[in-house]
Amino acid sequence: MGSCVLCSIVGQGSNSLHVTYQYLDNVTTHLISRPGEREKLPFTLQDVRAAIPAHCFQSNLWRSLSYLFLDFGMIALLYLAAAQINRAWFFPIFWILQGTLFWALFVVGHDCGHGSFSRYRRLNHFLGHICHTPILVPYHGWRISHRTHHANTGNIDTDESWYPVTETQYHNMAWYEKLARFHLILFVYPLYLFRRSPGKQGSHFMPESPLFRPHEQKQVLTSTVCCVLMMSVLTAIGLHYGWGFLLKYYGMPYLVFVVWLDLVTFLHHTDEDIPWYRGKDWYFLKGALSTVDRDYGIVNAIHHNIGTHVAHHIFITIPHYHLLEATAAIKPVLG
């Protein structure tokens, strides 16, 4: 394997947010090829599923819609408050709150992408665009690459994102790739949408990208057109009201949203003790269990309990409002 560059959490337990970057030789190799890792887990996917109450796998359309309406309603109220107050002291507060709600809206669209929002596929895709287009996420492009991530979680060779890279890969990376991945990791999501992760080819916006199958290209094009239209609207706002206005009311909340997305996904897939597998050492359940649950305190309810990540990775069709119950149910099985 050789030495790896790994973004890792340093501190006591999984609640620490102090991030460092370090070369890990023996440690990373140990995590990838730890003795005994080839052995099967003492429980199966069926064992885990059997522990979860059946209703946890059922989505409720009206309940799902209530979260969608709540997020859009709060976003609208914050815009109204910002316009009414219109004081310099309020805008930093507005940026943090609104950016957090943009992130919450992304999570609702995330449920649409997994099919856990409702049992109606076309409705899921329509509402997924309603959630993701305003925050410049190409819904289908993201949905399909995210599917790849879930199908390969914990596989160092095929996972879509947040995987450690070898020292050789590190030295072969362009300077801007090193800058983005190891120094600006909380701001790289827009770049990832255009370029993917280091060593991966393609773009979430381009239908002919190797990310997508031929029959998916029209869907990807639809999402790209939606994002282009959104950019046109934002450009028109900037031209009419001024670029400072656009930055103040959209650009800064969008930046906070990007930080939330990168921070949360980083924390769910990075820890000093997380193993990475390759080849026959990997299989789906082992990979899914290499994710990490995180507690975000009062933000848990705002961003729809996305911190319950292990249960989500094992069963992507569980709606976010059932993940807490599902997590509690599987703990005795997982040990």
Predicted regions and their residues:
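Acidic (Asp/Glu-rich) catalytic motifs at the cytosolic membrane interface
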Residues: F102-R121, W142-N155, V264, H268-D271, ...
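Juxtamembrane helix-capping/reentrant segments at transmembrane boundaries
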Residues: F117-L136, D159-E177, R278-D295
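Residue-level signal for cytosolic alpha-helical hairpin/rod architecture
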Residues: L127-G128, F187, G307-A311
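Multipass alpha-helical transmembrane domains of eukaryotic endomembrane proteins
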Residues: H204-V220, F266, T270-I298
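Non-catalytic, topology-defining segments of multipass membrane proteins
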Residues: G2-G99, H132-M252, Y321-G335
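Juxtamembrane/interfacial segments around transmembrane helices
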Residues: H125, M173-R181, M230, D271-F284, ...
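C-terminal, well-structured subdomains that either form a transmembrane helix-short loop-helix hairpin
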Residues: N300-V333
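Transmembrane alpha-helical segments that form the membrane-embedded catalytic/substrate-channel core
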Residues: G99-G109, P138-G141, L186-Q201, Y250-R278, ...
